Design a protein with these regions (language model features):
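Short, conserved phosphate/pyrophosphate- and ester-handling motifs at nucleotide-, phospho-/glycolipid
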Residues: 247
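N-terminal nucleotide-binding beta1-loop-alpha1 segment
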Residues: 1-27
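Short phosphate-binding loop-to-helix
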Residues: 72-109, 117-118
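Conserved core of the sugar-phosphate nucleotidyltransferase
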Residues: 118-224, 236-240
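Short, acidic, metal-binding catalytic loop of nucleotide-sugar glycosyltransferases
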Residues: 48-55
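Short internal beta-strands
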Residues: 57-63
Length: 266
């Protein structure tokens, strides 16, 4: 297994002026502080990262007014060999990643504070793929996701070989690979903005993927050529890793899966 030091970046910010419904319901300032199974969302993510091999540092991208609530959570996971610090979240995902990576050469592991089902096996899988790539993103098949929970995910990317859901964990080999994050510069979901997809991946590639006439490996080769760096996919057999706490529905799903996992660990 590939094992090398890696900096973990946890995106925990939220849009300025927008009150997250889950945070409002829980009476907290930020979604990352919403409790699930008795602990804040981000606490579950930090636990997974702190339990993983060779995480050299954890950087949390978050607004200043959330830091006081994070102090005891950080204290529970920080060690002499694992510093955890906060850096101000920027206005978008890309700028937040760039700010969190400032002054560091990489490699980087990027995830989100609502990725509560993250585990060490997922981190190891991404690390393994990143040893052979500039950038890595993670996927689980629709069968794996629906097997984990029938209501866990409703959006899948259809390829000729299978349909996949995205998992919110990414690997970037070095600072040069941060240009991969520029794909998301405009923010939002690709599915809602075809023009954004075309600019990022090229029209011919989008058409091949849109109509499911190309396999995922073939698509990765074509997109790698388009972007001029090696892009690889980490395949997760655990479909639960494609389920984040996005809304009331997925909160309930994650709560059920977390409780089941914690019971099994006893």
């Amino acid at each position: 297994m590939a094992d090398y030091p890696i900096t973990a970046i946890v995106l925990a910010g939220q849009r300025a002026g927008v009150v997250n419904p889950l945070a409002e319901r829980a009476g907290v300032s930020h979604k990352c502080l919403v409790p699930i199974c008795g602990r804040p969302l981000i606490d579950h993510v930090l636990q997974a990262l702190a339990s993983a091999s060779n995480i050299s540092e954890i950087v949390i991208s978050v607004e200043e007014d959330a830091k006081s609530g994070l102090v005891p959570i950080i204290a529970a996971h920080q060690r002499a060999d694992l510093p955890i610090r906060c850096t101000p979240a920027a206005t978008g995902i890309v700028d937040s990643v760039l700010a969190a990576a400032e002054g560091r050469d990489g490699p980087f592991l990027v995830t989100t504070a609502d990725n509560v089902l993250l585990d060490t096996s997922a981190i190891d899988t991404v690390r393994e793929e990143l040893a052979q790539a500039d950038a890595v993103f993670a996927l689980a098949t629709d069968k794996a996701v629906l097997s984990a929970h029938p209501d866990g995910q409703r959006n899948f990317y259809r390829f000729r070989d299978a349909s996949y859901a995205n998992c919110n964990i990414y690997g970037l080999a070095d600072r040069a690979a941060l240009r991969a994050a520029e794909i998301f510069r405009e923010g939002g979901q690709f599915q809602a903005n075809p023009g954004r997809m075309i600019r990022a991946f090229g029209l011919s590639n989008i058409l091949l993927m849109r109509f499911g006439v190309i396999t995922l490996p073939a698509a990765l080769k074509r997109v790698s050529r388009k972007l001029s760096f090696t892009l690889r996919a980490a395949h997760f057999t655990n479909g639960a890793l494609a389920i984040d706490v996005d809304n009331e529905r997925t909160y309930a799903v994650c709560e059920q899966l977390l409780a089941k996992r914690e019971f099994s660990a006893q």
